[in-house]
Amino acid sequence: MRILFYTFLVTVTSIVTQAQDSLQTRVLSEVVIQSVQTEEDTLQNFYRANQSANTEDILSRMNGVYLIRRSAYGQEPVIRGMSGGQINVTIDGMRMFGACTDKMDPVTIYVEPQNLKSIDASLGTNGSAMGSTIGGSLNLRLAEPLMNQKKVTGRAGIGYQSISNGINYYTDANFSQQKSAYRASFIYRKSQNYKDGLGQTVNFSQFEKTNLSLAGKWGIRKDTLKANFLVDEGRNIGFPALPMDVGKARASMYALTYIRHTDSRWLKNLEAKVYANEVYHQMDDSQREVLMHMDMPGWSNTYGAYADAKIKALKNHTLQFRTDVYHNRALAEMVMYPSDGASMYMQTWPSSYRTVAGVYIADDIKLPGRLRVNINARLDAANTSIEEGFGKDQLYVFYPQFESTIKKLTKSLNATARKPVLNNFVLTFHAGYGERLPTQAELYGFYLFNRQDVHDYIGNPNLKVEKSLASDFGIGFFNNWLELNGTAFYQYNPDYILAHIDTQLDAMTPGANGVKVYENISDAKFWGAEFSLLVSPMKNIQLISNLKGTRAETSAGEPLPFIPAFKKVTSLRFEKNKFNAQLEWEGALAQTHASENFGEQNTPGYSIFNLRAGYHTHNRLGQWSFSLGIENLTDKYYREHLDWGGIPRPGRNLYSTVEFRF
């Protein structure tokens, strides 16, 4: 695998591409971590630290991206302090939504690195290509079958992790012909409860999952047709930070894509896709000591399509047009079984539907003096409705006048300028405006228990769209052996959606301290910085370092929840012939700006060290690769600020992997 790291100076911090024996630096408009068939790339070993790493591990090392951790599995992406409905997460351009009211199943858990070709990240309001957003976007691009290659290629590997007695099996294969190709991959993971830095077992941290993907690609003259199928199923997934675990989490994805590459003077390429995905999630408390057993299933089904075209309209203008539509249906239920009475039923997400149609246009303009400007805009029309019946009747208790159907328009407009100055510097500036829709949970949620602040949450169908005004400034320096980039950003969010205590309402969950209701507050603000460094002083030595941090508060000066501390990761790598070694230093500053209103506590800083090594060799059958390492070398007891419930991170972990390629 080769990982190419492109960082938008305005929105992230650097872009680096390693060629066969030299570093080439470009500055583009997004972060991309891209997989191709090689093991010789510096950044692969930074982002995907070992072959047992999952998608969440890779995301956590990207600048501007963080994770809310409730377990060893099912971690929720955060972009510059924004998460949930504030950001867009797509799988190969497909809209997809989790089915858990407790956010145990962000859609990123349903894909594995072996499924992926690339991860694209755009930060802030500039990430609106695939949907209106205020916080940014992540698009996980699926790997494609490769045509015109050796007829059959593939790999198989096994990994082991001592901290959780975890096993990871993976395999993929590509069958190639001149006009067609087929790809299949399979992954199996199983981990027991892990131990923290004090040697104590973190109960309910186990998980098991399987992942299968199939893809076909056919060349028809200048056209390409692709078909994708992916199914991912997790079982017996523990969540130590929550009062319930997950019995089953299953997602299925289907897609058919048409691509046309032309020699036309004006139309460069056209891509159209139709897709569907289904998510089922079943919470489980059968292994917990509870006062009352509950069944809590959830469903989320999405169907959609898009068309995307790039047009060379004028000599110095490249236009992108995209139109898309999706329809989502979500439902979550709860059945309670009191020990001394009849069962009780409620809908924690009342059955609701959302249809969104949008259009996006961008103009990339080349101006004299190597100045490059990108202007983009998006308009979405959304129709959200709640189904007549039980779920709607629940909300009538609180909102007797609310409308069954909510219609809203969301808008975004962004401008970015990039200017090389002197010989080795690049300046970038971005200003933008964006809006986002309230989520179905924020609109219709019914007594959703939040373990972090011990409150029940109720939605508000009268919410307005949340807005954001954003600006970024970046500066970069590069030469043959050094790349240094820094970015500062600021966002002002009017009508920020936040939940506040309603003292007029009584909690339903036993032990809950009260009820919170979502509302629009006047505003909130976010600011922070990101920094990256890549040094290659010698052919065999590379140093990579990333630093990122965000601060956020309301207009009243109250800290916002889920804001990470400043974090750094530094990696020093040595390669010689068939051997490599890598030393990493990871750490974070203390977070003393915690949101006590949302159950947060100040978090101390930490530093940990990781040591990795690898060796590869060839024989007539193919290539063998061996790797081993020690993570958290000093067995440090620590946690990060976004780790719910004070649950500690794993202690010292010895891992090893063996892989064969043919």
Name each model feature, range by range.
Residues 20-49, 54-56, 84:
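Short, acidic, small-residue-rich periplasmic hinge/interaction motif at the N-terminus
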Residues 51-59, 75-78, 90, 106-111, ...:
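N-terminal periplasmic accessory domains that precede
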Residues 95-124:
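Short acidic/polar hinge/loop motifs at secondary-structure boundaries
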Residues 191-193, 203-209, 221-270, 275-302, ...:
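Flexible loop and strand-edge segments within Gram-negative outer membrane beta-barrel domains
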Residues 215, 298-309, 348, 352-358, ...:
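Outer membrane beta-barrel strand-and-loop segments of large Gram-negative receptors
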Residues 316, 324, 350-493, 536-539, ...:
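Structural signature of Gram-negative outer-membrane beta-barrels, strongest in the C-terminal barrel
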Residues 367-369, 373, 381-382, 489-493, ...:
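Gram-negative outer-membrane beta-barrel transporters
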Residues 492-495, 499, 543, 589-594, ...:
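C-terminal beta-signal and adjacent terminal beta-strands/loops
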